[in-house]
Amino acid sequence: MLVELLDAGKIRMAGISNANPAQIREAREILGGRLVSVQNQYSPAFRSSQPELELCTEMGIAFLPWSPLGGISNAAALGSAHAAFADVAAAHNVSPQQVTLAWELAQAPVVIPIPGSSRPETILDSVRAVDLLLAPEEITALDAAGA
């Protein structure tokens, strides 16, 4: 168990994955302040982890969305599948993928998206999302898209 590894000093902190709010609370109770992250799926197409994101924000636990662009087979079509993301991207002259990551970062200070990439240009595009500041009305429009 994680608590045994923590208590033995084998690891300093722990994270969990694919957890619901009850499981996050239970892990926090068992591990105390040593639970530092929750990794759940979260993207424009998959927002059912919103309660977990909100709980992590409340508890100060990092929330790491996996497949933040909707998965490798859906990332390229993100703009066509979610018009609001394409519209905001066009307004900023950036990719819909960059807008998606910036939107996720804007959800809460605890959000750390973990996009995958095999091409240098998409890695650079993802990194640029940290500098893309979305206006409140853009965030509202993106929140509403696909909700």
Regions found by a protein language model. Give the residues of each.
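Beta/alpha (TIM)-barrel catalytic core signal, keyed to glycine-rich beta->alpha loops juxtaposed to Asp/Glu
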Residues: 1-147
